[in-house]
Amino acid sequence: GFVLSYPPSTPWERVRDATLELLSPTRCVACECPGSLVCDACAARIVTIDPVFACLRCGAPFGSLLCTECQSESSQDDQVANNCLAACVFEGVPARIVRAYKDGGERRLAAWIAHALFDAVHRAQKAVPKRMDAFALDADAVVFVPATPAAYRRRGFDHMEAVAREFSNLMGIPVLDALAKWDACDQRKLGRGGRLANAADAYDVVEPVAGMRLLLIDDVITTGATMAAAS
């Protein structure tokens, strides 16, 4: 599930974290209850996606075939994400977690998000093993959707690189910094057409990955434009 804790790995980290905890106690990023980054009550409210009843292309929780959005784009395969797996619905608690991590400076959530992704893979391996055989079980490496240079400067770190490194440790496969992303406008306020146009040709492959089976991860999938362009 999503109730997780991550003890520091070195004596220095334990001293540092204990001092920080005294000065500024950890609070739940969703409800501000003291004690943990995500409290048990908020974790219990997270709506996970059952892969058995998810769109085969984008992973949305709208049935076991193609959702209506993917059906409408079925003739434009180059612009649509394919064979995606989503951990949970991006609303309520998960939305607060991602915002606290990306824009609120709570970098400790990288491990939490990585565990959520790993939990989704584990559930899918049990529920839809044939589908998972297609990419997860034999993956050679993890690749992450990189931040734009502007987003990196604003946040001071690449949020998905940190998640990818945690996730790759859980999966037992290496992480590759294989993609470079050029500056583009923020997609959060764009519609479907705008997202597709914005994402097109936004990425370059900067590592030799030909012939490899890769797990591409990102924090949020809306229209699938980013995942399609990056893949």
Locations of the language-model features?
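Glycine-rich phosphate/pyrophosphate-handling loop used in enzymes and phosphotransfer proteins
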Residues: 1-231
